[in-house]
Amino acid sequence: MALNGPGVYHRTREHEQEDASDITKNILAESWKSWPNEAAFDRLEEHRGPLRLTLKGTIPSWAAGSLYRTGPGQSRVEDTARGTHFTTHWFDGFAQTHRFDIIPSEDGETQVWYSSRRQADEWIADVKKKGWRSGMTFGQKADPCVGIFAKVMTVFEPKLGNHNVALLANVPGVPKDEETEVSNGVPGPLGHRVNTSNLFVSTDYTGIRRIDPSTLQPLAETTQYDLHPSLSGPCSCSHAQRDPDSGDLFNFNLAFGRVPTYRIFRVDTASGETEVLATISDLNVPPAYMHSFFLTENHVVICIPASHYAWRGLKTQWEGNIIDSMKPFDKERKCKWLVVDRRHGKGLVATFSTPAAFFFHSINAFEKNIEDEDGTEQTDLFFDLAKYNNMDIIKGFYYDVLMDRDDATKKYWFKNDRYKNCAPTLTRYRFRLPSAPTPDTTFSASAEQVLAIPSPHAGELPTIHPLRNGKPYRYVYSASLRGLTTSVDALVKTDLDTSEAFIWTGPEGHTPGEPVFVPRPGAEAEDDGIVFSLVVDGVNEKAYILCLNGKTMEELGRAEADFAIGQGFHGIHLPAA
């Protein structure tokens, strides 16, 4: 099959059907059995370091700074009161944050230093004491030995943090008394510092955990309630959106109840003040699990996918985890979109629907002003996302499935032909904004699908040029799959104008993570920069930071560790101070 070997492949729209079909062929051939990936998920260690990595090739000196990554670390806790505790879902792996310092030296050779720190020691200590995990989780399977009374009572315990999803830098509006807790003046190797006022780790809960940018030490937690007293709901979005020009931060807060309530808000970078842009409380606007949303030049846009919570959200309190609190997928349950004005105080200005689907990650959104046939100026909104046909992917991230324990991969994905729904499609919708605000909660309007690029020509964990957020753009970088392993197995640059794809593939057993695009200072071309990705070598149980040319996806260099590093979720590159 055309893409099964290592290399860089240039593919066009004409190859889409062939390459998508090869995913199915690889899955049916059970190719994952010859792709070891346990090193990306299990028995991961903390290395406070800093440790110097071995550089092969080159990393441009202009990329000086720190690449931070976060995600699940260890997945088991030994020697608890009830034996070994096993985490069942990858999203519940105990948080660990990593820092790769990229430091040019006087002799011209770039050095890369690595350190990491666990972020959930308090929760791990609680598990050791009790022998089981209390508090809210994403998908931890219930312990049959734990009584229903103990299960329910954990809802009322103080929340134990497991912030393991995304990183936010220079967050405005956080309580000033926390500033004294951050060293950020403690230099790393060779006096290295990064240019940031603060650094936080987020999850799909309203709290974000502050960490020391230099030592990675976990510090105080800030909740959305600290930003504004009306933001009291328990759920939010890991991926806050940021205006690339002003730096203003946007997110939403979801409160459960008889009528669930969404509050979409902005934190002003200049003043630190938080403004609630819209409050939406309507029985036709269901509570749902959402991991990301959209930002355009003038609007915040929420897409509520088919992942609705049961009992108007209150089932989360009964189940104690997100997966078991969601209603089963229903193809009649359309995605509902909320368009909120972010410039002029108009609140909810439009709603529309698209066919039932699920997504973790928005990619980007933007606006275009056009003249219709009558010469009237209209505004079209465009939304790009990594869309799944249904919600099967969520349970595909149980550790048993990812590491193929007891043939779990085949048992899960082959049942009811679920494998047909394992790969996302880059999907673009277009919606014409009404000339006057139309906050119709019947969602009678609809958007048009205008672009669809299937895997492996596009993928998951998408990133773009950071200054193109909310604006027209051309390129997206993502981690894609060819069906050779239980997660992703390739990196891809997708041209949205031509549907061309440049696909990087490593040797067998080399599992890449999210690509992080770093633009070259002063560059004009959107793809003039480099792409970093953490790659886990499952054969030798080691890892390396891969550096690719942003234009060609050819390797420039890599910094190798002689131990495994968790594949993780998301990262951020911060320039040197």
From Swiss-Prot:
Fe(2+) binds at H239, H291, H361, H570. One of its GO terms (molecular function) is metal ion binding. Binds 1 Fe(2+) ion per subunit. Torulene dioxygenase; part of pathway that mediates the biosynthesis of neurosporaxanthin, a carboxylic apocarotenoid acting as an essential protective pigments and leading to orange pigmentation. CarT mediates the cleavage of torulene into beta-apo-4'-carotenal, the aldehyde corresponding to the acidic neurosporaxanthin. Is also active on other monocyclic synthetic substrates such as beta-apo-8'-carotenal and beta-apo-10'-carotenal to produce beta-apo-14'-carotenal and retinal(beta-apo-15'-carotenal), respectively. GO terms for cellular component: cytosol. This is Torulene dioxygenase. InterPro entries: Carotenoid_Oase. Induction: The expression is subject to photoinduction and is transcriptionally co-regulated with the genes of the other carotenoid biosynthetic enzymes. It comes from Gibberella fujikuroi (strain CBS 195.34 / IMI 58289 / NRRL A-6831) (Bakanae and foot rot disease fungus).
